């Protein structure tokens, strides 16, 4: 990154032949989703089964924001003479590339368009040599990732067998140079835990070329070099999503980020990590101000909050402006409901470069800190090394949370993301006195396990579930009388459609009126879920 946020202190030297203007990016806002061919009754048309199951687990209903943008609107805009680069179902708009900015008046005149925004210029970048990289650390001081893992006591999870197995993570970043050949990712590829890679920048579809930032971040989570290096979440599965446009810095990158996080949601990932941030751009008229850092201005921040609302755990780097004139976190680190991660040194002191909170509206940011000074990672050549930046503390935290998520899923019938994160926040060494640079501080995941156990012990998998019985003859649910009047009850189809949502006031609920076909349904009572077989 250049003028946005350099989230890792590495010096890059790029040698380019030329830059050639090839168009203008715009964001186009639609008024509605009227007459869409998609339906809330059939979310499998636009969400993966895993995405639907995640919503059901956390009690999140499929709603209108999940519906894709109206394809007729998209087609009409395209036929004006522009290229559709990205679509946002959550924000109900599209990112376009126009060769002639004068054509935009025709788009503004369309009856379903409420506004357009210029977001940057597209250039073609030609490389004549590889990236020349120097790092402000001479050599690795400890040979593996032990220090950064033990600092937050994730080894306690590892020792119990929780290494993020079954957890899917999206890494939203720049390029992933050599991730398809790097020996540090041999086990990732061999065990088919590399789920796929996508470019959202409409530039180079080969995400394994040119840029190494994303690959470095990935190695912190899943790098594996026997006796040399072990990532913090080595058994998780990963999507590699490129949203960073390397040739320049424009507002359009926030829209690329939105496309990436929406894809991650629809693919059904459990978590996302992004070591990117946005505040200033090549065109100063696009710059954010600190007052914009309230979670409601940047489209990336709005989308990050929406991802959290849909059950994703989202980790974002705080930024490296602690000693700079900007000083504060940037977008999307200002989003509500996500985990913004600052940096500390091995001794626990804050890294001087780590950006400060709070948000412009006074919320604690960053929430947590992990080791971002002299953090161990694996280079694109497959050699363990170290570097600095909140780009590196964020994947440390994301990987730790992935292990913690596996622990929670294997020990409790149900829980919320809020309960999970609260257990971690409360384990922070400054939880009772949040600090502007470190938030709740350095978490202790051994303590977080205890916190979660205390919180959820009443719904442990060793405890009984709600007593529910389905009588197929009269199509009636019979429910334990002890919980009548105390909880809400929701019945979902396996596709995530809400069949009913009501206050539980009687121990008998007739399903006749719903004409349910024989299938498996998900019943949620309060904070617990269980399957109901209708036949």
Predicted ranges, named:
Residues 146, 267-273, 406-467:
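C-terminal subdomain of the subtilisin-like protease fold in secreted/lumenal serine endopeptidases
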Residues 460-535:
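C-terminal outer-membrane/trafficking sorting elements
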Residues 218-221, 241-245, 328, 372-438:
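Hydrolase catalytic cores
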Residues 158, 163-164, 224-227, 240-334, ...:
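Substrate-binding/access-modulating region of protease and related hydrolase catalytic domains
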Residues 21-23, 40, 115, 155-198, ...:
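Subtilisin-like serine protease catalytic core
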Residues 173, 192, 330-406, 410:
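Extracellular S/T/G-rich loop segment that most often corresponds to the catalytic His/Ser-adjacent loop
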Residues 19-85, 102-105, 111-125:
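Primarily auto-inhibitory N-terminal propeptides
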């Amino acid at each position: 990154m250049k003028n946005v946020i350099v989230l890792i202190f590495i010096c890059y030297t790029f040698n380019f032949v030329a830059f050639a203007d090839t168009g203008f990016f715009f964001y186009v806002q639609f008024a509605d989703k009227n007459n869409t061919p998609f339906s809330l009754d059939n979310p499998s048309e636009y969400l993966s089964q895993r995405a639907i199951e995640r919503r059901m687990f956390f009690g999140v209903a499929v709603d209108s924001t999940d519906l894709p943008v109206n394809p007729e609107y998209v087609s009409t805009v395209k036929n004006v003479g522009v290229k559709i680069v990205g679509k946002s179902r959550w924000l109900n708009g599209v990112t376009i590339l126009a060769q002639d900015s004068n054509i935009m008046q025709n788009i503004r005149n369309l009856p379903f368009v409420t506004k357009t925004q210029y977001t940057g210029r597209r250039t073609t970048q030609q490389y004549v040599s590889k990236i020349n990289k120097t790092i402000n650390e001479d050599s690795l001081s400890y040979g593996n990732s032990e220090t950064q893992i033990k600092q937050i006591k994730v080894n306690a999870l590892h020792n119990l067998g929780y290494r993020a197995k079954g957890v899917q993570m999206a890494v939203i970043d720049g390029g992933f140079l050599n991730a398809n050949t790097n020996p540090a990712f041999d086990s990732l590829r061999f065990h088919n835990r590399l789920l796929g890679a996508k470019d959202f920048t409409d530039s180079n579809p080969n995400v394994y070329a040119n840029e190494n930032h994303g690959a470095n971040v990935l190695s912190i989570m899943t790098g594996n070099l026997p006796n040399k290096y072990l990532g913090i979440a080595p058994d998780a599965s990963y999507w590699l999503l490129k949203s960073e446009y390397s040739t320049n810095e424009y507002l359009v990158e926030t829209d690329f980020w939105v496309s990436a996080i929406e894809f991650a949601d629809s693919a059904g990932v459990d978590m996302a990590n992004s070591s990117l941030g946005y505040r200033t751009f090549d065109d100063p008229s696009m710059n954010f101000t600190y007052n914009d850092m309230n979670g409601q201005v940047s489209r990336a921040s709005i989308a990050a909050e929406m991802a959290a609302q849909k059950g994703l755990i989202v980790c974002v780097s705080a930024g490296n402006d602690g000693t700079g004139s900007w000083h504060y976190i940037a977008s999307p680190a200002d989003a509500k409901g996500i985990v913004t991660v600052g940096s500390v040194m091995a001794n626990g002191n804050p890294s001087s470069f780590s950006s400060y909170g709070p948000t412009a509206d006074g919320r604690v940011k960053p929430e947590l800190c992990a080791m971002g000074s002299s953090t161990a990672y694996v280079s694109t050549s497959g050699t363990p090394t170290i570097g600095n930046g909140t780009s590196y503390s964020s994947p440390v935290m994301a990987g730790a949370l992935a292990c913690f998520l596996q622990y929670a899923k294997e020990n409790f019938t149900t829980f919320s993301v809020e309960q999970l994160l609260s257990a971690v926040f409360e384990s922070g060494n400054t939880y009772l006195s949040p600090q502007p640079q470190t938030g709740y501080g350095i978490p202790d995941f051994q303590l977080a396990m205890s916190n979660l156990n205390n919180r959820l012990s009443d719904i442990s998998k060793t405890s009984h579930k709600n007593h529910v019985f389905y009588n197929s003859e009269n199509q009636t649910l019979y429910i334990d009388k002890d919980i009548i009047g105390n909880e809400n009850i929701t019945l979902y189809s396996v596709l995530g459609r809400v069949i009913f949502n009501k206050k539980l006031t009687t121990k008998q609920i007739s399903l006749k009126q719903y004409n349910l076909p024989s299938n498996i349904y998900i019943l949620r009572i309060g904070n617990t879920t269980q399957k109901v077989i209708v036949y």
